Amino acid sequence: IPFIKAARHYCPDLKLWASPWSPPSWMKTNGHYAAASAGEDHDEKYRNGLPKEKEGHEGTDMMIQEPRYLKAYALYFQKFIRSYADEGIPIFAVMPQNEFNSAQIFPSCCWTARSLATFIGQYLGPAMMQEGVSVMMGTMERANTALVDTVLSGSQSAPYITGVGFQ
């Protein structure tokens, strides 16, 4: 927060967006911050303690897809937005998940495009609309237009998406 405030001192019109690397572990199917294991085959500093059998994989959902979890996660976003606003830092947009199609050894969470569309359309989109915050889809690190098309063509999710980000 101090660095953001310092940057805004020099650029008062600075626009900030936010994107989580992972939902809280208790909201994930594997109960771990990471989606891929980093065991004995990795340098000790990268080992994360995730057993191989609890790894996630691209094209699967690691976020628990129950309404109570999805509603709670949207509330996390709202509380984040409000907390930063209380510090004088407006957030103009959020992305529901950074690299949602990648299982990583660091904080990460795979989502299917269909589940992401449901989360945006029924939970995150309405919550962010209440806060006056846009929803962007991203970040996509591989050009898989089918994933984007699924979310952008969803009758519930599409109205909330204001942009798509690729890297």
Residue ranges and their predicted role:
Residues 1-91, 122:
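N-terminal catalytic cores of secreted or lumenal carbohydrate-active enzymes
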Residues 69-167:
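Active-site neighborhood of glycoside hydrolase catalytic domains
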